[in-house]
Amino acid sequence: MLMPRRVQHRKQHRYRTKGIAWRGSTLAFGDYGIQALEPAWVTAQQIEAARRAITNAVRRGGKVWIRVFPDKPVTKKPAETRMGSGKGNPEYWMDVVKPGRILFELAGVREELALEALTRAIHKLPCRCRIVKRERPGEAAEEEAS
């Protein structure tokens, strides 16, 4: 499971997600990717489930890049606990995802297999996503000509 090795502060505020992602919104490594279309809190468990779905679909071929990292702790108080007495203990880790953020990238596999693998991974994520494909410089000109 993904989580930070060390953190400066064990507990953080739960802030509201505003705006769209400017950084991390384009494909940087692979040929295909998953892009978030709405804001979400993606937990470490959801990231791991999506990663497993991709690796199971592509088997040995291809390379997967995880472009998000769960660095925000989410605290929770025990059940049937009275109000007050401080903030709860960290329960799990998550990442705040803004619309437009690339979550996963994939390279080294056929297009049909990549679309199948990324579709499986999208079903594991808590927000609406779309599959994006890297545009090659010559591809757009070829499509317009035909």
UniProtKB/Swiss-Prot annotation:
Taxonomic superkingdom: Bacteria
GO CC annotations, alphabetized: cytosolic large ribosomal subunit
CDD domains: Ribosomal_L16_L10e
GO molecular function: rRNA binding; structural constituent of ribosome; tRNA binding
GO BP terms, alphabetized: translation
Keyword Repeat annotated: no
PANTHER family: 50S/60S RIBOSOMAL PROTEIN L16, LARGE RIBOSOMAL SUBUNIT PROTEIN UL16M
Homology family: Belongs to the universal ribosomal protein uL16 family.
NCBIfam families for this protein: rplP_bact
Protein name: Large ribosomal subunit protein uL16
